[in-house]
Swiss-Prot record:
Gene encoding the protein: pgk
GO molecular function: ADP binding; ATP binding; phosphoglycerate kinase activity
Organism per entry: Rhodococcus jostii (strain RHA1)
Gene3D superfamilies (alphabetical): Phosphoglycerate kinase, N-terminal domain
Keyword set, alphabetical order: ATP-binding, Cytoplasm, Glycolysis, Kinase, Nucleotide-binding, Transferase
UniProt name for this protein: Phosphoglycerate kinase
Residues that hold ATP according to the record: 211, 299, 330, 359-362
């Protein structure tokens, strides 16, 4: 990777210097309880290394999708508490993004202190389509760290977005890739440069439209492309089969039909599914052939026959990339497909395969289903960023580090 890394910054010396770090702390919340702290834990090594080296660490991050103004339900307060616990040191939380409180706290930092700015998306300039507005916010962030400050990009989950705290700020300060971003790019490089074969990709999730670009990019390059999740039913409909009340994108049917024809030897789809009479955890459910989904019923998971077939493919693979659950794993009745596929990937990894879980819901499923995280070679923190990288798109937050 042709960028300077955290090690380069640490070697140059950070004691007494303020360092702005863009982390990805966008964790799921239930009220003010963090249900999956994975991204906080993944962000800790960079922050810890800087604090231990005597830097004044100023962290900026977002949570959820506030509408460009302060909103208590998206406050980083619970994140600050968890981050302090993970780091084993006090974390101050500024009452604003780049306002009076943030400035006063930044000026009062001593070596090794950590300051978390309030949700960066409380400021509308962060996601503005106007570059001049984003640059104004970036300059305000730079003011917090001063003339001898530095910027560390460690939020892999946002590097595919040209936002003020990801892109513009890197143009204004000496910039470095944090440990997490550096590791993620190395991992994705292994998937794209010369993956060991057979190379299998597993894609799930609800919409074909969300995954179309990655399907089109990967289908010509991989040996096997397994498709499950809600998006599968559009592929099923493309074969002229009734899908009942299952999720189906009518506008994508012709596209799915063309993909199935062009990549008949590569794309593998379920043969049986678990259907339900309603979308709920306690719905009546049954296992049926994909040709027998009754009207009024919906597919919420892949069936056991499909799990066995996919497992046979995956356990013989040498490289596996997985993005998206096979079913509604949040409901116990419809979690077996996701769990079975994940266990097959773990088995392949144990036999020497290189496996990557592509962030988002897949990573959440691994944790919720109690699967060992170290059973995979790598669990990415950035679902969207991973997919865009594999699609061959330029990631603005990476490109700017190379400049």
């Amino acid at each position: 990777m042709a960028v300077q890394t955290l090690d380069d910054l640490l070697n140059a010396g950070v004691e007494g210097r303020a360092v702005l770090v863009r982390s990805d702390l966008n964790v799921p919340l239930d009220g003010d309880r963090i249900t999956d702290p994975g991204r906080i834990i993944a962000s800790a090594p960079t922050l810890k290394a800087l604090a231990e080296a005597g830097a004044k660490v100023i962290v900026t991050a977002h949570l959820g999708r506030p509408k460009g103004e302060p909103d208590p339900q998206y406050s980083l307060a619970p994140v600050a508490v968890k981050l302090a616990e993970v780091l084993g040191r006090n974390v101050q939380l500024a009452g604003d993004v780049v306002g009076q409180d943030a400035l006063a706290r930044a000026e009062g930092l001593t070596d090794g202190d950590v300051l978390l700015l309030e949700n960066i998306r409380f400021d509308p300039r962060e996601t503005s389509k106007d570059e001049a507005e984003r640059t104004k916010l970036a300059k305000a962030l730079v003011e917090l760290v001063g003339d001898d400050g530095a910027f560390v990009s460690d939020g892999f989950g946002v590097v595919h977005r040209a936002q003020a705290s990801v892109y513009e700020v890197a143009k204004l300060l000496p910039h470095y890739a944090g440990k997490l971003v550096e590791a993620e790019i190395k991992v994705l490089g292994k998937l794209t440069e010369e993956p060991e074969r057979p190379y299998a990709v597993v894609l799930g999730g609800s919409k074909v439209s969300d995954k179309l670009a990655v399907i089109e990019a990967l289908a010509p390059k991989v040996d096997t492309l397994v498709i499950g999740g809600g998006m599968y039913y559009t592929f099923l409909a493309a074969q002229g089969v009734s899908v009942g009340n299952s999720l189906c994108e009518e506008s994508m049917i012709d596209t799915c039909k063309a993909l199935l024809e062009q990549y008949a030897d590569v794309i593998h789809i379920p043969q049986d599914v678990v259907i339900a009479d309603s979308f709920s955890a306690d719905a009546e459910s049954k296992i049926v052939s994909v040709l027998e989904i009754p009207d009024g019923w919906m597919g919420l998971d892949i069936g056991p026959q499909s799990v066995r077939r996919f497992a046979a493919i995956l356990t013989s693979a040498k490289t596996v990339f997985w993005n998206g659950p096979m079913g509604v794993f949040e409901f116990e009745k419809f979690a077996a497909g996701t769990k079975g596929v994940a266990e097959a990937i773990i088995e392949a990894t144990g036999k020497g395969a290189y496996s990557v879980v592509g962030g988002g819901d897949s990573a959440a499923a691994v944790r919720q289903l109690g699967l060992p995280e170290d059973g995979f070679s790598h669990i990415s923190t950035g679902g969207g960023a991973s997919l865009e990288y594999l699609e061959g798109k330029e990631l603005p937050g990476i490109a700017v580090l190379e400049g």
